[in-house]
């Protein structure tokens, strides 16, 4: 979790995320993503929060520091109760969702992206469509859609370093993928180095 010299155990808990919020506030970063692990995953129910997270307390703390909270959500859990999830968390003060694992571009998933954008817009929530295909204009219709993954971002270095020449790929991205629209690259996931002189963790 990259926090040294703190008086708490780092992880998916309020003290860790308060430290992230403090950092964001001090450095003019508008949002902090409460990443995977905040909700009880086995039930795929976004209304069940893990015991180490007091979500309302975090949202209020972030608001006091002029930072918004974005919640990571798996696609299935988000889709199965989208209206209630968006209403509930918007009322709490959450600013948006980062939805993940759509992982395909068929008609059903494209329709899901539109439903998610429309529902989030209805509740004035921003949306990061992570784990989805490249953009095709959805963010023009729904400006609350911040970005789309649709790319082998830096997180790829965690599981496929030998098969990806990330440096070469990154140099090409502005001229290939980036032309189609905003991109969720997941920067910061690993160290930046050329293929010949790094070993991923």
Per-segment meaning from a language model:
Residues 1-64:
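Conserved structural scaffold segments of CAZyme catalytic domains across common CAZy folds
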Residues 36-199:
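Aromatic- and carboxylate-enriched substrate-binding clefts and catalytic-loop regions
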């Amino acid at each position: 979790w990259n926090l040294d010299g703190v008086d708490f155990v780092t992880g998916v808990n309020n003290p860790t995320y308060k430290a992230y919020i403090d950092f964001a506030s001090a450095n003019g970063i508008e949002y902090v993503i409460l990443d995977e692990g905040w909700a009880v995953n086995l039930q795929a129910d976004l209304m069940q929060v893990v015991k180490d997270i007091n979500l309302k307390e975090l949202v209020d703390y972030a608001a006091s520091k002029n930072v918004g909270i974005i919640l990571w959500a798996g696609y299935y859990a988000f889709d199965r109760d989208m209206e209630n999830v968006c209403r509930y968390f918007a009322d709490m003060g959450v600013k948006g969702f980062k939805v993940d694992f759509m992982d395909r571009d068929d008609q059903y998933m494209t329709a899901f992206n539109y439903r998610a954008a429309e529902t989030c817009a209805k509740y004035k929530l921003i949306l990061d469509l992570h784990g989805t295909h490249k953009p095709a204009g959805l963010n023009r219709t729904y400006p609350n859609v911040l970005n789309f993954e649709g790319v082998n971002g830096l997180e790829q270095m965690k599981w496929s370093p030998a098969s990806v020449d990330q440096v070469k790929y990154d140099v090409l991205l502005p001229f290939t993928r980036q032309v189609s629209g905003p991109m969720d690259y997941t920067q910061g996931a690993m160290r930046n180095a050329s293929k010949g002189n790094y070993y991923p963790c």
